[in-house]
Amino acid sequence: MPPLGVDSLTFDCRDPAKVATFWASVLGYEVVEIDGDGADIRDPNGLGWRIIFLVVPEGKVVKNRLHLDVRPTGSMAEEIERVRSLGASQHRYVAEGGSFWTVMLDPEGNEFCVLRGPQDGWSPEA
């Protein structure tokens, strides 16, 4: 039997429309559907995973077990400002193992990391 492929990534959240709209703006995705139970966003070019946001009654209470790392096309500082303008907040800066990144929180407090970009010395060959 062939290995399974990943169909989608699902976030549990209190306000799926708000969180889906935030992530669509961050990733350049399109909001495909928003209804009373959730929301769905996809890459407009059909690349990447579909991301689903489902409503749950409880709020976030512990650190995420899984999070997204986003790689800027410019600098980390520019990307941090961009995602802050979309509703994210800065949680902490991390420098270890010869690299650095910034942990951010989406509008419902889910952690994600903004990595260093090409203007910060990152290259795909490194």
Question: PLM features: what roles do these ranges have?
Answer:
Residues 24-25, 80-86:
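Short amphipathic alpha-helices in soluble, non-transmembrane regions
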Residues 68:
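Phosphate-centric recognition/catalysis
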Residues 11-15, 71-74:
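Short, surface-exposed ligand-recognition loops at beta-strand->loop->(often short) alpha-helix junctions
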Residues 17-36:
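N-terminal first-folded block
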Residues 17-20, 75-80:
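Short, conserved charged micro-motifs
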Residues 65:
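Short, conserved beta-strand/beta-arch hydrophobic-aromatic motifs that form part
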Residues 2-8, 32-34, 39-42, 47-54, ...:
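Vicinal oxygen chelate
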